[in-house]
Amino acid sequence: MSTSKTITFTLFIAALLSSCDAATNATSQPLFPAILIFGDSTVDTGNNNYHSQTIFKAKHLPYGIDLPNHKASGRFTNGKIFSDIIATKLNIKQFVPPFLQPNLSDQEIVTGVCFASAGAGYDDHTSLSTQAIRVLDQQKMFKNYIARLKSIVGDKKAMEIIKNALVVISAGPNDFILNYYDIPSRRLEFPHISGYQDFVLQRLDNFVRELYSLGCRKIMVGGLPPMGCLPIQMTAKFRNALRFCLEQENRDSVLYNQKLQNLLPQIEASLTGSKILYSNVYDPMMDMMQNPSKYGFKETKRGCCGTGHLETSFMCNAFSPTCRNHSEFLFFDSIHPSEATYNYMGNFLDTQIRVWLSLRLKS
């Protein structure tokens, strides 16, 4: 099914579901017993705060300025990130804690944690340059989590929780930015972007299979956003005073996402009992870029922090001026969406998940 048909079908089903049983959607019962998060800064809720090797941290203002306590938590935006928003919409919990956070309660462990690390990617080269926690090492953290979970609820119950948990994987942009587009360290090995895409997808395939071997069955894998519309990419390929999306990088994202959509059913078919969902982030984000007023956005080509052209992580700090109304900006810094954007994305993906569950129950 083409991307346009997929999004149309999803929105049609969403309207159908919302008109059927409002009480069901409003139930306080969680749709999954736990949520387990892997990936990069789009889903890292603060693991890098406790990872001394990396400089990619968000434990300072203005990050977190719109959280309830107005304090930075390690999330790379002004408030909640996607991890928290989707966990809230699925009635699991309001905030997903980072696994490396000291003194996590038993309840936090039982209902799920985040293993993601800002700066990570599927390609090990990515973490070499960022010193983020490699995806492979996130898997090792997950093994430690399983041991802790078993000590709390016992072996059988622990594996039941993991089997029924929603696993979210969000990574990929750092691989292309740091190894191909801006720092071409992989271009000699892969002269054509298609070859590097296949390499990254093979690493993704291996990672999903490893999670399956550890007991995960319900897995949502995120595609790439419109990479050429990230403010930092517009800056990196600066041509004139008019900032615009880089069409070639967007076409690359579309091609990667098409390959990913073809790959995931193959992985699912080979892993008995697995249920794997492609998370479409490209289309809703592109719609926000092209129709900003529909979402209340006034700025889509630069971030809210500093100039919005380059600042991220330590470059976006307490001395950086910020925009007056954070919710009017699609991006909070030069890479990361604002909480408002994550909210819209969360609404879209919540619909995807509910449609997915509905169709699975009937199959």
Swiss-Prot record:
Carbohydrate attachment residues: 25, 103, 325
Matching CDD domains: SGNH_plant_lipase_like
GO biological process: lipid catabolic process
Main location: secreted
GO MF, one annotated term: hydrolase activity, acting on ester bonds
UniProt subcellular location: Secreted
GO CC annotations on file: extracellular region
Class of the enzyme per the UniProt entry, highest EC level: hydrolase
Signal peptide: 1-22
EC numbers: 3.1.1.-
Keywords for this protein: Glycoprotein, Hydrolase, Lipid degradation, Lipid metabolism, Secreted, Signal
Domain of life assignment: Eukaryota
Residues annotated as the enzyme's active site: 41, 333, 336
Family of this protein: Belongs to the 'GDSL' lipolytic enzyme family.
Full protein name: GDSL esterase/lipase At2g24560
Organism: Arabidopsis thaliana (Mouse-ear cress)
